[in-house]
């Protein structure tokens, strides 16, 4: 994939800020973590004094983000009420433990770093005990480096790009409580192995700003590349005028299995044009990635109430949507209603009150409490960030929407579902398969009516498919009779011309050879006459 992400910020700048706040904090300096608090001996929970945990939440105030403070804050406060009340915290933490939370605007750039450093500098070393966020890649990178340097645990439902998986040095104190983009790549790999596919076209929107779709398909590209699968890539900027015909032509010229990432309206427009080009009758398999469990990205919905609905319903029979697997339980319903109520009180009306980020930051609080409990029991303190972050890795716990599993590298396993149209007449869609990240297993659901029939979708990846324009009401599969006749006649004419050229060339070569032999014979006779003439002259002399 072109220009893979390199998250770089000046180390001199980071070191300067670190020195500004260094020395007086209780956590010690260095990425190793835990060294400063080891000598205190082991204490039991009952003997520990109440803890005041200072949490710094770094998220953007701009509500256009799915992870804005307005959206996520109710989920964090819901989790805090749970752990401070009669829930997890009362059982795990010393009596009287309280969380003091500060919310700062991270924007989606350097402001997150400046907020953290300004807060520390103002109190000369009063570092927070926990950092939640940021989400945006370019905001999270310097904060994660600083957290590592200051021995602070950092939990985020973002920082999902492939670069953050390298935890051996600068990102050693980061735990990602939402599935990273590479986990989507692992899911797509399992799906391809199930269907015995080896080639894919990656088609995505890239505005060069947040680049969510770019980072998503970067994860898919990296996993496929490691496993030897072939990918072709085509990107566009959907914030500008789109040439949908050009997008579809590039798909036709590349692969039969297409993985797309864009807004729901753009996905619908691409599918409509593909349908008009006869590409939705089984020659192609289209997949759309629904990012973050948000309908802002293509969620598989074809209906808009416009004149194209009937055509879109037909087109979407060839589209499958990949989304996060969700286990609905009573507690989740209560959580969703409380988040919705809190958000609406702040004057924000939207469709997606609860998405991956809202769930993730709620679960981050629960995970931190579990890890802190184990660290305190072992005789360490809340300032031993390295110890705390290690306790968040390689474990499974119950989150708000189901089980959450973090791998040995501090990244959440991704569980995903595949949605497809199972009733073309009604346009009904349902889950047809699930991927379980911890086991690396993809399973088709039993007793589901698959649109293509068998459990495996057969796509001829090597066949070149000819396409003709067709109206929505006509069958768009195969070639018309006149086209077949034209191909046959053209092939016969071509063969006839080749044979005529062959015989002409053969006759011409024979003629040339005969003429050459005759000339050589005449030349020999002429030479003999000249020699006889010369001898006669010498004899006369």
Swiss-Prot record:
Residues 505-541 are cytoplasmic. Keywords: Cell membrane, Chloride, Disease variant, Disulfide bond, Glycoprotein, Membrane, Receptor, Signal, Transmembrane, Transmembrane helix. The keyword Glycoprotein applies. GO terms for molecular function: chloride ion binding; G protein-coupled peptide receptor activity; hormone binding; natriuretic peptide receptor activity; peptide binding; peptide hormone binding; protein homodimerization activity. The chain crosses the membrane at residues 482-504. It is a single-pass type I membrane protein. Has low affinity for peptide hormones in the absence of bound chloride. PANTHER family: ATRIAL NATRIURETIC PEPTIDE RECEPTOR 3 (PTHR44755:SF1), NATRIURETIC PEPTIDE RECEPTOR 3-RELATED (PTHR44755). Belongs to the ANF receptor family. Homodimer; disulfide-linked. Dimers can also be formed through the C-terminal cysteine of isoform 2. Interacts with OSTN. This is Atrial natriuretic peptide receptor 3. It comes from Homo sapiens. The gene is NPR3.
């Amino acid at each position: 994939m072109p220009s893979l992400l390199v998250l770089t910020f000046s180390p001199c700048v980071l070191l300067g800020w670190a020195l500004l706040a260094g020395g007086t904090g209780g956590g010690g300096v260095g990425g190793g973590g835990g060294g400063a608090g080891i000598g205190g001996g082991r204490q039991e929970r009952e003997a520990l004094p109440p803890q005041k945990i200072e949490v710094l939440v770094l998220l953007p105030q701009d509500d256009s983000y799915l992870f804005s403070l307005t959206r996520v804050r109710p989920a964090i406060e819901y989790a805090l009420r749970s752990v401070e009340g009669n829930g997890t915290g009362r059982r795990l933490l010393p009596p009287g433990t309280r969380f003091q939370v500060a919310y700062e605007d991270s924007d989606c750039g350097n402001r997150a770093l400046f907020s953290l450093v300004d807060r520390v500098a103002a109190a000369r070393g009063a570092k927070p005990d926990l950092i939640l966020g940021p989400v945006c890649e370019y905001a999270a990178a310097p904060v994660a480096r600083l957290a590592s340097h200051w021995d602070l645990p950092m939990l985020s439902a973002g920082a999902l790009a492939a670069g953050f998986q390298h935890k051996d040095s600068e990102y050693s104190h980061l735990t990602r409580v939402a599935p990273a983009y590479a986990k989507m790549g692992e899911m797509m790999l399992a799906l391809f192995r199930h269907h015995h596919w080896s080639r894919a076209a990656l088609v995505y929107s890239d505005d060069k700003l947040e680049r969510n779709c770019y980072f998503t398909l970067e994860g898919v590209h990296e996993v496929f590349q490691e496993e030897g699968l072939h990918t072709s890539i085509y990107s566009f900027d959907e914030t500008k005028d789109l040439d949908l015909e050009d997008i579809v032509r590039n798909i036709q010229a590349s692969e039969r299995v297409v993985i797309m990432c864009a807004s729901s309206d753009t996905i619908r427009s691409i599918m409509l044009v593909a349908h008009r080009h006869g590409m939705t009758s089984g020659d192609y398999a289209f997949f759309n990635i629904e990012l973050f469990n948000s309908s802002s990205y293509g969620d598989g919905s074809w209906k808009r109430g416009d004149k194209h609905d009937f055509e879109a319903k037909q087109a979407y029979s060839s589209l499958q949507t990949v989304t996060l697997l969700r286990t609905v339980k009573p507690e989740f319903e209560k959580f969703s209603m409380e988040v919705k109520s809190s958000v609406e009180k702040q004057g924000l009306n939207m469709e997606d009150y609860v998405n991956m980020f809202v769930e993730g930051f709620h679960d981050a609080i629960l995970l931190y409490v579990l890890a802190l409990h184990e660290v305190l029991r072992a005789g360490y303190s809340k300032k031993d960030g390295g110890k705390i972050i290690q306790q968040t890795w390689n474990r499974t716990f119950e989150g708000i929407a189901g089980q959450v599993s973090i791998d040995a590298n501090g990244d959440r396993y991704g569980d995903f579902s595949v949605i497809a149209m199972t009733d073309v007449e009604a346009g009904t869609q349902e889950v047809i398969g699930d991927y379980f990240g911890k086991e690396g297993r993809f399973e088709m659901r039993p007793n589901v009516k698959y649109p293509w029939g068998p459990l495996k979708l057969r796509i001829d990846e090597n066949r070149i498919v000819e396409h003709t324009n067709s109206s929505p009401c006509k069958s768009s599969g195969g070639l018309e009779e006149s086209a077949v006749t034209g191909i046959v006649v053209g092939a016969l004419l071509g063969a006839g011309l080749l044979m005529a050229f062959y015989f002409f060339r053969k006759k011409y070569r024979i003629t040339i050879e005969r003429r050459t032999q005759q000339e050589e014979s005449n030349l020999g006779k002429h030479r003999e006459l000249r020699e006889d003439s010369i001898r006669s002259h010498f004899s006369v002399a």
